Amino acid sequence: MKTTATANTILGFAPLNDLFKIVEHPNERGAIVLEAPVDQAGITLYIAIDSDSYGHIERPGNGGIRLLNYESTKHAIDDAVRLAKGMTRKHDMFRTGFSGAKLVVKSDHKDLSFIDRKSLMTSAASALRALEGGMYTGCDLNTCDIDMDYLVEATGNRFVLAGRNSRVDTNVATASSVIGSILGTVEAMEGDADISQLTFTVQGCGKVGTTVAKELIRLGAKHVQTCDLYPECAKIPKCTPIKDWALTPCDFLVPCANSLAITEEVAANFPEGIKYCVGATNSPFANENAMSIFNRRGVMHIPESISSAGAILADSVEVRYVMLS
């Protein structure tokens, strides 16, 4: 997968065209962050591409579009860099041919329904076209299949890897990698793959978390607890909705929500008995100290570069069809 001269120029930091503004250089944290224009008030679009993409021109960036009401510009840029670096770890683990990248949309609106999604995706498409193959994207937090349809249309079905016009559902692919990681962990650590007597807490019941919870039930789990910011979403057949995932005992914590939720306080005060942390969330720990606390407590964490790799594996196949179309 090769990028073109335009993409290489941008990633190599020669003078950019007028479309992008560099807001962070790679010598700071190992990723370039570009700001792309958006024809919509209260919306800012950042693109973070890991250094490996311009260090190895045959590795274009890949990562989804995340939409959030960030507290500040710094929070949005930090998230973009962290997520791009995390995507590189996933791609490196499975040798997909991609490097890590992320599109992060900072919304000044707390209510995301105010956003003109088609206009936003048109702006994102302009940025992707300008990168000319240096970046491929798909769904992420608060973006959906309808958004991807807008993006496919605006890009001419280029640079979008979201399983559109196919039977592949990238959310199911991610959920499948979570389930596989859970079953592998249980078999390795408990002696067999029987999950019927284990208690699971699925934190976040969006597209991926809901699929994970339902699949755990289908595979024989009898104790699946579900928690979501929107209580209605946690009402999944044969599951038990809970109010506070961080205060409810379980054997398996399955993070499928926003990043950085496991803070030092959460890790230190999580109820006794937790054995494993395996989920879909990118960067579930707020910092290294939070992860270290879980480690000291004997909680086994399966890195998300393994447990949530389903979508990037699907992307690595889909990109061949996109490039040939």
PLM segments and residue spans:
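Glycine-rich phosphate/diphosphate-binding loop of Rossmann-like nucleotide-binding domains
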Residues: 168-254
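Alpha-helical segments flanking ligand/cofactor-binding loops in enzyme cores
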Residues: 214, 243, 265-268, 291-292
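A short glycine/serine-rich beta->alpha loop
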Residues: 162-170, 298-301
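Adenosine-phosphate binding glycine-rich loop
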Residues: 186, 274-325
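Conserved active-site and cofactor/substrate-binding residues in soluble primary-metabolism enzymes
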Residues: 71-79, 115, 119, 123, ...
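Short, well-ordered coil/turn residues at beta-beta hairpins
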Residues: 255-256, 280
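N-terminal ligand-binding/catalytic initiation module
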Residues: 1-164
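Rossmann-fold NAD(P) dinucleotide-binding segment
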Residues: 245-249, 259-277
